[in-house]
Amino acid sequence: NNSGDNIRLSREEFQKRHEAYLTKFAELTADEAAKFFPIYNELEKRKQELNDQIFGAMRESREKDLDEAKYKELLEGMSANAIAIESLERTYLDRFKEVISYKKIFKIKEAESRFRQELVRGMRRPGGEGRAGGPPVPDAPSNDRRR
């Protein structure tokens, strides 16, 4: 665990730790990881681009009071964004299946959830660890399933 780390990680270091976490949790071989992560990272980039559009609109709504029509437009955009992301995930599921098993894809999804939970837990830690430099990034899990 990174309980002693209170440094801001570069995007590359964060991605490296995230990939190590997912690889270990899903028990990917080196060959599987080498084939899987370029596809996975492409999906994540496309999802981020969609989310950036919505977050920009949400930021704008906090900076100035919008009328009802603008809030309606914002909510419709959020809904359309969720649908677009779901569609991307379905498309990429087919691509993931070409390089790893459904079982390992499922484990990746589970690992993503656990990784996020551990990030949030790190942000809530007494003393505000990570507050100045962001949350500590979880290390790859052990194969101890009692977590």
Predicted features along the sequence, with ranges:
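Proteins with a high burden of low-complexity, intrinsically disordered sequence enriched in S/T/G/P/A and R
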Residues: 1-4, 26, 105
